[in-house]
């Protein structure tokens, strides 16, 4: 069975493939013939943005996700704006730099990642989610992962997502948790 993922982000696709491959064949939106469709994420929540990503695509199973990093000391920012925290011309590095600047004098470093996966199957749309709690580091650590991974240490661990192997990260990450709930929903 094919799962079309409404993304061309190779990091996300790699994580998803590692977690569901063997049971399902994962295709990016471009591989499925939808490369010219670029939904605008203008929702006010992760749930809305995840659904926006899947609505224009068709297939046996279509999924789209949105993820946010919610920092307690910043009243939940960057939250739904995590991917564009440093502005429309921002990137992962600029987003991390902005977050570290804003956290410079903060003692409360608690944060959590939340991933919402929207699923379209047989005309039905539903969402599942996964949360990973942890804390923000004072500087970037590690070379793996993407996004805020070098700044986030999950609860119960002493290293950032970027310092973990893919297997370690997938076992505890927000996206890994959401994907496991998604796979269970198919069975």
Give the residues covered by each predicted segment.
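Anionic-ligand binding patches
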Residues: 2-4, 10-187
